[in-house]
Amino acid sequence: MRLVFLGAPGAGKGTQAKRLVEKYGIPQISTGDLLRAAVAAGTPLGKEAKAYMDRGELVPDKVVLGMVKERLSQNDCKKGFILDGFPRNVAQAEALDKMLSEMNMPLDLALNLDVPFDDLMKRLTGRRTCKSCGQMYNVYYSPSKVEGKCDKCGGELFQRDDDKEETIRKRLEVYRAQTEPLIDYYSKKGILKSVSGTGSIDEIFNSICAILEKK
């Protein structure tokens, strides 16, 4: 089972991917993690990526694809994998398909975790963190008992700058602009499945498993 996991920031991809790893025993491959690990290990691709990052530039697709190829060549990917955070646009999807075809590992499924825009805004802008112990809350879904105070330690709750409304709105708009063509791309290939990302974690997970077990 080889799949790409699509979903906006705040859709809950990380939570669901973790549960899929536990249930099916296939690795979750995050390009962000791959980049950090390659840079830390000082691999040839890591050094190349670091040179771009040090200049404040985006790491080119060919470097990221090289890292993905190295990771997919490892034994734990033989039964399948979950690609998370890549591809982000159609050009990357086409390059990934070409590479996977050459490796004889074509994708089985592109899974889109679909959450309405307003829900994503609440999930992300509603986040609050305790300054003292790091405990997380959400003013809409899981508020603290006393507004602005941590239930665990009484510390002050704050909103991170990157959770402010304007920042989140921009992030979601960029995601939507990039990803709508990607959803169309996988739909035309006949491998796209969408799952509603609203409901309990268990309900969403059961919907995903029902799709995977039909494959």
From Swiss-Prot:
Binding-site list for ATP: 10-15, 127, 199
GO molecular function: adenylate kinase activity; ATP binding; nucleoside diphosphate kinase activity; zinc ion binding
GO cellular component, one term: cytosol
Binding site for AMP: 31, 36, 57-59, 85-88, 92, 160, 171
GO annotation, biological process: AMP salvage; nucleoside diphosphate metabolic process; nucleoside monophosphate metabolic process
Keyword Iron attached: no
Main location: cytoplasm
Record pathway: Purine metabolism; AMP biosynthesis via salvage pathway; AMP from ADP: step 1/1
Top-level division of the source organism's lineage: Bacteria
Residues that bind Zn(2+): 130, 133, 150, 153
Keyword terms: ATP-binding, Cytoplasm, Kinase, Metal-binding, Nucleotide biosynthesis, Nucleotide-binding, Transferase, Zinc
NCBIfam families for the chain: adk, PRK00279.1-1, PRK00279.1-2, PRK00279.1-3, PRK14527.1
Listed HAMAP family: Adenylate_kinase_Adk (MF_00235)
Role: Catalyzes the reversible transfer of the terminal phosphate group between ATP and AMP. Plays an important role in cellular energy homeostasis and in adenine nucleotide metabolism.
PANTHER family associated with the record: NUCLEOTIDE KINASE
Name listed for the protein in its UniProt record: Adenylate kinase
Species in which this protein is naturally found: Thermodesulfovibrio yellowstonii (strain ATCC 51303 / DSM 11347 / YP87)
Taxonomic classification: Bacteria, Pseudomonadati, Nitrospirota, Thermodesulfovibrionia, Thermodesulfovibrionales
Gene name in the database record: adk
